[in-house]
Amino acid sequence: MLVRRLTLLLLCLAFLAGPAWSASKDVIYASESTAKSLDPHDTTDTYSGAIEKAICQGLMGFDKDLKVIPLLAESYTFNPNATEFTFKLRKGIKFHDGTPFNAEAVRVNIARLMSGKLKRSSLMKPVKELVVVDEHTVKFVLNEPFGAFINAVAHPGALMLSPAALAKFGDAISKSPVGTGPFIFAEWASDTVKIKKNPDYWRGPVKVDTITFRPVPENGSRLAMLRAGQAQYIFPMPAELLKLAQADPKVEIIERPSIVERYLVFNTRYAPLADVRVRQAINYAIDKQAIIRIAWGGAASEADSIIPSNLQFYKKQGAWPYDVAKAKALMKEAGYENGFKVLFLTPNPSNRLRATEMVQQQLKEIGITGEIQSMDVASFYNKLEGHRADDPTPVPFIGFGGWSSSTGDADWGIRPLLATASFPPASSNFGFFSDKKVDELIQAGLATADPAVRREAYARCQETLWPLAPWGYLFVDNLLAAKSKNLKGIYPLPDGGFSVEEAELSE
C-alpha cells in the first residue's frame, strides 16, 4: 500500500513539474521542518539556525565533526583564568549590504545579545563587557570564569548581522537577515525560504545559484519529490522507507551519528507531573525500543544519560528499563493509581506524530490518558515558549521534544533545558523543572576552564538528574539524509543542522 501510494505521488509530481530542472544550478532542499525565524539571536530551532548559517557567520564556528574553527575571527587568546577572551578579526570582509565587518559590528551584535531580551541572550550572559581594542580586535571580559565560552561564541546564536540592517529592520530582521556568508537571503514566501549565491563571498563564490528550503512534513512525499527530481536533498530521510530509497539508482543515502536527543517534556507546574514518582513511572512505562523500531525505523539508540554520548563530558547512566509493573506501583505510591489526563503535544512530521501516538498508547497502561494536538514545528515551539512559570492554570501537557546541544559541550545540553534560570522566555526549560543541587552543579561546570574539574561537575550533574526524571527519556537520533547523485557538498551535521557552502550540482 505504501509503495503504491509513493508511485502515485511520483506520477503526480512528474505531471505537475513539467520539464526536469535546467542547468541553472538551483537546489531544492525538502525538510520535515518549517523555518521559524531567520534572526539568529532570537531562534532556538536547529533548522532555522542552519539556514541562518548559510547567510550569516560568527567569529568562530564548527566543522563537520563539531570541532571549533575560526571564521570571522582569524585567531583568539584567553587569560589563564578564562575571564578574558581576545579575538583578532579578519580584514576586508563586508556584509551583503556593503557594511564593513569590524569591531564595531561585533560590538553592536554582542550588545544586542546582552540585552537579555532575545532567545539566545543566555549565550552572552557570562559577559560583563565587550571592549573594542581597535578596528579589528575585540576583547570579551567575563563576570567569572566560563570554560565553555569559545563553544558559546561558535554557536549559531552568536552569528553576526549587519548593524545597518539591524538599524533598518529592527525585529523584522527575522524576515530580512543580512550577513557575511556564502549565500544572500532572497525571499520568504509562505513557508518556503530561498537563498542565492553571494558573488562577493570572502572565501570565493559557491558553485550553485540558489537553494530553496521547502517544508514537506510527510515522509513519503519528501522521498517522492527526491525520486521525481523535484528535490535534490531531503532531510530527514524516512528510515521506514530506506529500502525503497536504496533501490533507486538516482538516490544516495547519507547516515551520520548525531547529538540530537529526543525526550518528553513534562510540565512540572501541573501537580501530577511535579511528583518525581510519576515522572519515573512514565519512564518505566515507555517501550523505547518499540518506538525506535516502529516510529524511527531503527535509526536511533536509547538515551542513557541526560546528554548524548558524543558530547564533551558525557557520562553514561544506563538506559531506563521498560517495566510496566514497576510503573504501576509508582503511580499507586504517588496517589495516582487511577491515572490522570494530559494533553499530548507534538510537531506533525510523521515520525514524531507516530512516536507520540505510541507514547499515548503505552501510557494508557498506567492510567495516563489524553488527546494529541499536533502542529508544524514552528507552532509547536511557539506554543511551548508561550507558557510561563506563573500561569494561574498550568497546562497539563506532555510534549515530544528534541534538542541539539549545538555547542558540543555538556553545558549546552543541560543548562538551557534544565536550569531554573532557563524558564521561558529566558531559554528552553519548557517543563519548568527546578532543582537546587542541579543548579549548583551547572554553575560548578562553568566556573573553571580546567577540563578535569568541569568533567567532575558534569558527571555529578548527570548522576543527580537521571533518577529525578525531569523528562521522559527516549533516544538519540542517527541522522539519515538522502540526495540525488548529481548533488554533492551538502551534508548533515551532528547537531541536526546541515552545511551547504560546498554544494555542487552536476548535469
Name these PLM-found stretches:
Residues 30-80, 111, 178:
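N-terminal lobe/hinge region of extracytoplasmic solute-binding protein
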Residues 33-49, 72-74, 99, 149-158, ...:
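A structural "hinge/loop" feature
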Residues 77, 88, 122-165:
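Surface-exposed binding/hinge segments that line
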Residues 102-109, 135-141, 181-182, 208-210, ...:
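Alpha-helical secondary-structure segments
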